Amino acid sequence: MNSLLRLSHLAGPAHYRALHSSSSIWSKVAISKFEPKSYLPYEKLSQTVKIVKDRLKRPLTLSEKILYGHLDQPKTQDIERGVSYLRLRPDRVAMQDATAQMAMLQFISSGLPKTAVPSTIHCDHLIEAQKGGAQDLARAKDLNKEVFNFLATAGSKYGVGFWKPGSGIIHQIILENYAFPGLLLIGTDSHTPNGGGLGGLCIGVGGADAVDVMADIPWELKCPKVIGIKLTGKLNGWTSAKDVILKVADILTVKGGTGAIVEYFGPGVDSISATGMGTICNMGAEIGATTSVFPYNESMYKYLEATGRKEIAEEARKYKDLLTADDGANYDQIIEINLDTLTPHVNGPFTPDLASSIDKLGENAKKNGWPLDVKVSLIGSCTNSSYEDMTRAASIAKQALDKGLKAKTIFTITPGSEQVRATIERDGLSKIFADFGGMVLANACGPCIGQWDRQDVKKGEKNTIVTSYNRNFTGRNDANPATHGFVTSPDITTAMAISGRLDFNPLTDELTAADGSKFKLQAPTGLDLPPKGYDPGEDTFQAPSGSGQVDVSPSSDRLQLLSPFDKWDGKDLEDMKILIKVTGKCTTDHISAAGPWLKYRGHLDNISNNLFLTAINADNGEMNKVKNQVTGEYGAVPATARKYKADGVRWVAIGDENYGEGSSREHAALEPRHLGGRAIIVKSFARIHETNLKKQGMLPLTFANPADYDKIDPSDNVSIVGLSSFAPGKPLTAIFKKTNGSKVEVTLNHTFNEQQIEWFKAGSALNRMKEVFAKSK
């Protein structure tokens, strides 16, 4: 018998949504050269927005126009910001290779023959930075051959475009090839909002949400509030687009954007390039925002034209009123930032909202004992790897070279795409970086997501790195909890590489040239777009054929077909144990680490061995050490969870504020469910993670009174009661039984709607999908 499992279809819906192909409804301008039969939806959007405006009788923000323009039932949909659940029809789905594995495994499990909307897979997360671009790429292709083959064949069979390893980072590829003003895109990566730089609503989701959209099921989103950020003045000197979002993070903090779309407007918008706007939208993920967006303007027109999409730019220009906010549109909150007076910022360490203006950084560093010597400077990532970013950084490196200086730190450059890499090589920027002492890494995420084989410091050694990345959680980049990571612009990162010091202020401080003379760096200069046009480089796209075989070996340690989670048995969840009570920040990195664990993203059982590895146990202040409340023995968190599961003991986890902050990885929800968890009880959730938990049949619950967190002991037995009358808006009750026999009753809130309650009852959203499809046959 063949040792490979051949995947067959289980069921299928009665019909599929047309891919924007009706000329009577859709404009006949293709959305991408890679999808010539899918067309811009502006006429349909206009019609739907008119229906909604006639109902609401008020001006709309840009966010509302795009979102409501994609409503499944615009005539009847309840629309109330922060209250209603919207049922939406996104234009497309994008998946990166680490999350696409589980998304495609779930889609295959659904039994459907083809995706219902244009979709793509992008290979960017599984390439480790070690020796440099070409060598690292070759090594990654060899190590991940099985996974890349699975994604390529699954994409080909089910109608999903496949961007090969080396093509670039998902968000840069989307910006270059697929994003357009008015787009509604969902992507299985938290930095999907990058596409807002071209005027689209691009939203990070878990893989199960992507499966819904690919299966032609309306996508649900709680109607977001809208935070308006008015930009006045102009960017100038050392101040860059990155500083706008670093300042916003300072104002709103890591959870200030939760449940809201951040919409930029005002005269200052016109001084920012399209890729700069992408940078700002990208890091909106760090404030918990649903997404971020800019109005259509000439910067977007120029970028679309430069990337071979002039037809789209012209069509968008015709619909500019649709692609900008109405006069008098109402925002739930307005923040004003004057770009004339904005200064460069450096945020960190350990959190992206701890902001220091460049003139205060040295003082703050000395006061807090942050290491002043910078060990590594890293530019690039999905946040800052555009041609403009590279030209500005190169202009600073060139000044140093002209004075006989090179980088004092290790210096790495991550191009965002093959197109950016080929273009900066052609235009001589790569040579400047090489002469400066820099190493150009592969077109991939690399150190930004922890794919970095760092050798210059030992684990536990206190040190500082400066990056143009987006996140700097503890251990995020190099798995060293003692590394102090600071996030800033590529300009400031490069300047600090020259000085080697965190307290260096390039606006005021002097450097010593090779000949002993003193000099100051001049403000960076850059080009929004390459004067000679973009060089596309190597062709790295595989179009789907609609046929082929997808194989998953049962002996694989990288890929594993999914088994359905068990249904709810109709009873209250009684006498559960507390696996861990987490104290402090608990991001998706703490729940399901990335880095070396990325290789197991397609194998649920194996990756579950990283559950809560770096979360701090409130009981003992330690990581990965919890007490088995049945045996009394201490052990690793995953091993303890497995023991509970083997013994038929269900468990919960207790958490603090903004639980699940960070990435969209649904493994942070799948793993607790796989290892026997039934509920996560916290003070508050990050949006994407809360939805991911619901999708997997878990109960994400919040304390009605956050102070009740302090009443809970890790040794308590937990019962969640009232599930027989589980209903939207109706709190549940938890009873915590102490070791002395006393009980504490706690009210728990939830955000489940009726459909999500059906997910819980079925055991998962995927189980519920199969039930619905089976009934429709």
Curated annotation (Swiss-Prot):
Compositional bias of kind Polar residues: 542-555
Region annotated Disordered, chain positions: 534-555
Cofactor(s) it depends on: [4Fe-4S] cluster
Residue numbers binding [4Fe-4S] cluster: 382, 445, 448
Keywords: 4Fe-4S, Iron, Iron-sulfur, Lyase, Metal-binding, Mitochondrion, Transit peptide, Tricarboxylic acid cycle
Residues that coordinate or bind substrate: 96, 189-191, 471, 476, 601, 664-665
Pathway(s) per entry: Carbohydrate metabolism; tricarboxylic acid cycle; isocitrate from oxaloacetate: step 2/2
Domain of life (superkingdom): Eukaryota
Intracellular or extracellular location(s): Mitochondrion
Catalysed reactions, as listed in the record: citrate = D-threo-isocitrate
Any one GO BP annotation for this protein: tricarboxylic acid cycle
Subunit (UniProt): Monomer.
Alphabetized PANTHER family for the sequence: ACONITATE HYDRATASE B, ACONITATE HYDRATASE, MITOCHONDRIAL
Protein name according to UniProt: Probable aconitate hydratase, mitochondrial
Species this chain originates from: Caenorhabditis elegans
Lineage per the UniProt record: Eukaryota, Metazoa, Ecdysozoa, Nematoda, Chromadorea
Gene: aco-2
